[in-house]
Amino acid sequence: MSHQKILILDFGSQVTQLIARRVREAKVFCEIHPYDVSEEFIRNYGAKGIILSGGPSSVTEGDTPRAPEVVFQLGVPVLGICYGMQTMAQQLGGKVMTAEAAGKSREFGYSEVRAHGHTALLNDIADFYSPEGHGMLKVWMSHGDSVMELPAGFVKMASTASCPIAAMADESRKFYAVQFHPEVTHTQQGRAILERFVHGICGCGTDWVMGDYIAEAVDAIRRQVGDEEVILGLSGGVDSSVAAALIHKAIGDQLTCVFVDHGLLRLNEGDMVMEMFARNLGVKVIRVDAVDDFMGKLAGVSDPEQKRKIIGKEFVEVFQVESKKLAAAKWLAQGTIYPDVIESAGKGKKGAHTIKSHHNVGGLPEDMHLKLLEPLRELFKDEVRELGIALGLPREMVYRHPFPGPGLGVRILGEVTLKAAHLLQRADAIFIDELRATHATERDVAAGACTEADIGKSWYDLTSQAFAVFLPVKSVGVMGDGRTYENVVALRAVVTSDFMTAHWAHLPYELLGRVSNRIINEVRGLNRVVYDVSGKPPATIEWE
């Protein structure tokens, strides 16, 4: 099926993927490509519109990225965001200056933008109106440079107290640009602005739906794989489960899943995964006991990046061993999704700053004997869940909280040991049990922990991800008449719509107290429980 589509040119922003997510939520297909793709590619792509992303560079420096000139020659609408606005202004004859040179303040965080005039992009979109009747937007800013002089043909579309030109437009050519970030949830009308651009200005319809994606993905997998066999690393998490279902739908018994039990899974997860997949998917699954291998490689290693690399490499080596038992296995399938790729910032991502590597994309050796199949790498987590439901997977599987590929290896801070893993498994299970068993009440609404629409829902469903973390410290305690000196665990629960940004979950105190009491009383070796109240940013969701 041929889609109407938007081309997103990436200048290295860590939230470029969010632009794609918002566009797809508007049921418009889009793809992200590096800013320096060829003119031929852009001309042949057939985009209904082009979006220029943000980025960490400064257009005031001569060797930093620029948009291909063809972008402004195609005759299609263009939207510049943050750095995208700055490079648009500079390339079309405007003037951009650093905050220091302009004598202005940098803007990072919330800001109020005042709209100027009536443009196709912002007309009638506002969070509130000033006493003078000006439309006002609450937005998220993250910039040091600013446009100080407009290019010919442009008008000022918005401003802030610190940024005289916070948005600009050339309506005749349908060129628009905003200094703020409409793609992040902090910009309250961001979704409306992007929908206005793709639907109202670019003229795109709504032809991106998951049913169509399944048909296209199945066809693509069949063409890519042919009659060769595929081996997939199954963790029991959402991503690998949906990948398995999609690939199985495409090639059936050509797929063999390998479930690696490395001792770093959730409590009793190995048995549950085997039972679930035998009952629900009918997929061939081989269970591999690799606890000793993984623990041996991880012994003495405390650096989180090294742990991730070791775990990723060991996974691949296990798959290679198993693939030799499958005469026709030529492909290694993985449940890599967009957030994995953006946070790794490793492949096809020029100028981005690495946050951390993922085992799916950061630990693959160059001499890997298997070709790589990643059918979900262009999907966000919510799209993966939607795909799983469309494929017929049970809700309890699809809406299970995410679990990192390296497992508890990145939830045990410092050196990974079996003792720490066993303690953490039991503490984590208690936390999840209590979240499932506790439901939101009117009292929680009054405390501001949730909304009236959440009453009756379990706190497991009201949190996007929740887990325990084993800390590499001990604390003094008192149990009975005796002094204890035992380990500490941290509880982490977040609420997010995209896993790119997140807020810590305001769990009821009674729930937290109950979890803490159970862990300390039921898990010998733990005597203190703490709760993580950090958002993302500045923290990441996982501790390592």
From Swiss-Prot:
One of its GO terms (cellular component) is cytosol. The keyword NADP does not apply. InterPro entries: Class_I_gatase-like, GATASE, GMP_synth_C, GMP_synth_GATase, GMP_synthase, GMPS_ATP_PPase_dom, NAD/GMP_synthase, Rossmann-like_a/b/a_fold. It catalyses: XMP + L-glutamine + ATP + H2O = GMP + L-glutamate + AMP + diphosphate + 2 H(+). ATP binds at residues 235-241. Pathway: Purine metabolism; GMP biosynthesis; GMP from XMP (L-Gln route): step 1/1. Its EC number is 6.3.5.2. PANTHER family: GMP SYNTHASE [GLUTAMINE-HYDROLYZING] (PTHR11922:SF2), GMP SYNTHASE-RELATED (PTHR11922). This is GMP synthase [glutamine-hydrolyzing]. It comes from Dechloromonas aromatica (strain RCB). The lineage of its organism: Bacteria, Pseudomonadati, Pseudomonadota, Betaproteobacteria, Rhodocyclales.
